Amino acid sequence: METFDLESHLKGAYSSFPEAKHQPVIGITANYENIDATLRDRYYKQVIAAGGTPVIIPPVADSTVIVNTLEHLDGLILTGGGDHNPLWMGEEPSPRLHNINQERDAAELMLVRLAFNRQIPMLGICRGIQTLAIALGGKVYQDIKQMVKHSQDADRSEPTHSVEIKKDSTLYNIYGAEKILVNSFHHQAVSEPGKHMRIIAKSTDGIIEAIESNEYKQILGVQWHPEWLEEEGGKIFHWLVNQANNFYAAKELHKRILTLDTHCDTPMFFPQGIKFDHRDSRILVDLHKMTDGRQDATTMVAYLPQPQIGESFSSKVAFDVQGPAQYADLIFDKIEEIVSKNRAYLSIARTPADLYSDKRKGRKSIMLGIENGLALEHDLSNVKHFAQRGIVYITLCHNGDNDICDSARGCNTHNGVSSFGAKVIQEMNRLGIMVDLSHAGERSFYDALEISQTPIVCSHSSCRSLCDVPRNLTDDQMRALAARGGVAHTTLYHGFLRKEGEADIMDAIAHLEHAIEVMGIDHVGLGTDFDGDGGIRGLADSSELINFTLQLLRRKYSEQDIAKIWGGNWLRVMTQVQNFGK
């Protein structure tokens, strides 16, 4: 019986603690008509039935409002409604175009793009699948040619035609069937899903009925209205709520742990005048992308190309400098300029304590490194010079032998580490700088392991057992590295993950897990090589790094182990090295 006693309604919240268990928050876009923002109850009732907390999102085309809204969401539903204005696709209106909804178009297209940047799980329904496609680079038919009736007269809860589903798809995983029956209320449909999405279901007349992310993101669009299909339709809402719950768990985990990428080459783009405080399409790491991917810190290196015999260093770089050392200094000057312009949000960190302090203060961190000991110019005093500039590691060589050691892509000039290279390693030990053997030849690797009095690192190196290239580490190398307390960080350069086909996030996870099997959980991590040709499908830039965490959570790694992978192991070694140098 209905009661009008407020206290009795609140009893469920007040009689135990906490007042409510956590539920993922699902934003649902509202329709707009005659100054009213409205929503049919079927949408939010399905969300509640699936275990989510629904929040209605009004159509407001204001990026500040949208961004602040998204900060509180774990999932997003794009609802049905009127046609899109074809001008958003660069097309003129067809005579068969129906009523457009100007208030919704810009607001929802912005909403999708900003949610996509943040890796928020999304479900598009009817108009919503079309919103997904348009926002992510696809296209929509203004009016479909129908061989099957796609705008039924039957009751909304009545399925009226079939949909054929691809077996390797989210929909197949949800329904366990290659064909399901759906309702239908549309005269438009997706014509091209765009580069980020793939087709996973069609009707018998070839109309696209469902699309999903082809980048391992939790994004699904369906052309029918599952909110009306009771329990069968509810399965899709359960999928979204489950994904939103996983996303919430990953976000919360990133609040508690430090996330550090140990190698990026963003300074290679400094000659192009990149803007680190913009969402700059020319680079894979910037403040926007780090924030979207909930990444705390990156190690930004001064990369020095190794000249061939007869080449000058100045001919290999864009800036007018006298030599390698001056070039490295110029790169660090420019990083310091970037930090100076963004002091409220960005800092240079030199120690693990600096990183944790920056995280507490809400700032992103950049650590400094040198990729190629060529920067030392055969002058041991330059090790101290760069230590004073705040570098945390030197990658001894790059693609080609130098005066320190032989490269994995070298000519065996020294048969390993040179006599000068041995002095460099000893001086790095003395000054608390990590010795990085990524790019080094196998003999150089073992020599450095014997010479160094502190553990060595491989900031961006994958597994030769899975991708047989000289640049990767053998299992024996990894065992030797672990035995000396070192770490090797899986990299995202496609050619080091697989020799054939396109590398993706699953390849990166496979290399990580092989390294764990060989070395143990205390000796692994991630060094993306972003902006140095690193970046793969599913982990294409810093904004997608939370997807790495999601994959680890799906594989039931503990919070402690994920923290180790995300930089804890690296910082243990850094602490040992820096303490030795004191």
Task: Identify the residue ranges that each predicted region occupies.
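N-terminal beta1-alpha1 cap of cysteine-dependent amidohydrolase-like domains
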Residues: M1-I125, I134, Y141, K145-I174, ...
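Proline-centered loop/turn at the N-terminus of a beta-strand
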Residues: P24-V25, T53, P121, K139, ...
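Glycine-enriched alpha-helix->loop->beta-strand junction motifs that scaffold or abut catalytic
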Residues: Y216, R294-Q295, I391-Y393, L431-I433, ...
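N-terminal hydrophobic targeting/anchoring segments and the immediately downstream early-domain regions
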Residues: A249-T413, D468-H489, Y493-L526, F530-K582
